[in-house]
């Protein structure tokens, strides 16, 4: 199992203890979800394959006062991880047309 703090240090991203707790809660929701939002194998590597990869996008966008749309959001990736580290400087919109996944996203947010 991966270490969450190691994942953030590889990105040179400092996150508060509160933000790290939110990532852990989000991870638990994804892993415990019955509809298999990510594969069983990916669950072991969620910090790198999903959270770390999502946050790499922050290197390419200015994270301040933006409206960001995550189309086909599925499990909320990359929208939710980006929202967690942007410190409410942006507005995020998660778009998902599959009802069960949209219900999951509503539960998360």
Predicted regions and their residues:
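Conserved SAM/SAH cofactor-binding pocket of Class I
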Residues: 55-109
């Amino acid at each position: 199992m991966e270490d969450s703090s190691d994942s953030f240090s590889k990105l040179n991203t400092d996150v508060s203890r509160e933000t790290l707790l939110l990532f852990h809660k989000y991870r638990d929701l994804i892993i415990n979800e019955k509809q298999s939002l990510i594969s069983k194998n990916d669950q072991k590597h969620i910090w790198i394959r999903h959270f770390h990869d999502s946050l790499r996008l922050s290197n390419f966008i200015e994270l301040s006062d933006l409206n960001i749309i995550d189309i086909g959001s599925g499990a909320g990736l990359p929208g939710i991880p980006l929202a967690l580290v942007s410190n409410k400087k942006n507005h995020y919109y998660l778009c998902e047309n599959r009802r069960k996944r949209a219900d999951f996203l509503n539960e998360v947010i």
